[in-house]
Structure formats: C-alpha cells, structure tokens
Amino acid sequence: IYQSFIDFEMESVDFDRIITGDLGAVGQKLLFELLDENHKDIKKNHMDCGMQIFDEESQDTHAGGSGCACSALMLSAVILPKLASGEWKRVLFVPTGALLSQVSANEGRTIPAIAHAVWLESGQE
C-alpha cells in the first residue's frame, strides 16, 4: 500500500476505499502502525474484506480467516457493484494472503505473505 502511494504519486484521500483481503483486527492494527511510521494514514477509508464478513467476537478471527475467499467474495458482491453504480469512483484493492506451508509451519518458520495492489476505477466522473 505504501509503495503504491509512492508509485502512483497518490495519497489515501485519492481513493474512496483502500481494501485489504483479510488482515483481521491484528493485521489491521499492524498495517496502521506501519503506515503511521511512514506518515500515511488510511484509517478513514480502509476496509478489510474479512472484517466485513466475519464477526470477530463470535468467530474468534483476530488474525483473519481466508484472504483469498474473502477478497473474491467482497470483490464480486460489494466492490464491483459499488464501482458500477458510481458510488465509489476509485479503489485500491490489495487482496492480502499468506503463503501457508505445513512444512514451514511445523519447522517454526515465518509465514511469507503476498499482496498485489490493484487500482480499480468506475470509469465515471
């Protein structure tokens, strides 16, 4: 997200929403801290797909569920319709995901993550 702001020469206010896959409450807090260190604030327009789908209290999803599934569901059911209707004009969609491996988990290794930023626009002024 930070690198996208640099590459696109834009700020968070240039997007209606900055949407992540499924960071959960734990990941969202870390994301905000990392961006704050670089003087970037996305709190007002950030949305996490998993946090929209899951109930943290009843489902114990503090660190997220499935970024791949949450991203696909929210893209087709919420994001694209809001862009098509013109409610949102520009979205930075960052479907976050962990590259899980049973071997590396059993060996106590870290879990690598991936996130590709996709800039989506409604095409409407």
Enumerate the language-model features and the residues they cover:
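Short, well-ordered amphipathic alpha-helical segments that serve as non-catalytic structural scaffolds
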Residues: 1-8, 74-79
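Claisen-condensing/thiolase-fold acyl-transfer catalytic domains that form or cleave C-C bonds
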Residues: 16-125
